């Protein structure tokens, strides 16, 4: 475990919201960092490190990272609902935990924003969300990981489980 902690700590020390080292290929291509599923996976892992260790540096990093992207009105820099891309829902999973811990109302507003994408996502005849608007009628396994847990969490917490039948 020590080697993992050391690796994660070094990675975080070298990372900022503008230049996360775990997403180095974007930096090498000269692309601006934006709201994305890779950062969502990593920040979720950082929050798990906090939950396990109770070391505030992990919470601070995760909060600073997501806080950088989320405006007070809940809008998210680099996030476009219009893309209809289920990948973009993944980072939204971090908002629930950060909202619980910090109480920042902007995180609650951002949760609602990400949830609003669920309502407009195109679907296959079977009811599954398309992976992306640009891939009609395609369902990808990682897309289910990206979207369904967020959808379920939102329904459980904020919508009286009204759409559970849609999720199952």
Q: Which residues does each predicted region cover?
A:
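Low-complexity, Ser/Thr/Pro/Gly-enriched N-terminal "stalk/linker" regions
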Residues: 1-70, 105-113, 121, 126
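Surface loop/turn signatures of beta-propeller and other carbohydrate-active proteins
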Residues: 6-13, 24-25, 75-80, 130-136
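Carbohydrate-binding/catalytic loop surfaces
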Residues: 21-37, 44, 85-98, 129-146
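Amphipathic, non-membrane alpha-helical segments in soluble helical-bundle scaffolds
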Residues: 32, 59, 81, 108, ...
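Well-ordered alpha-helical scaffold segments within catalytic/enzyme domains
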Residues: 40-55, 90-104, 148-160
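Blade-loop segments of beta-propeller domains
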Residues: 63-100
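Asp-box/WD-like beta-propeller blade repeats and closely related beta-sheet repeat scaffolds
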Residues: 107-145
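Loop-centered beta-sheet repeat module
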Residues: 161-168
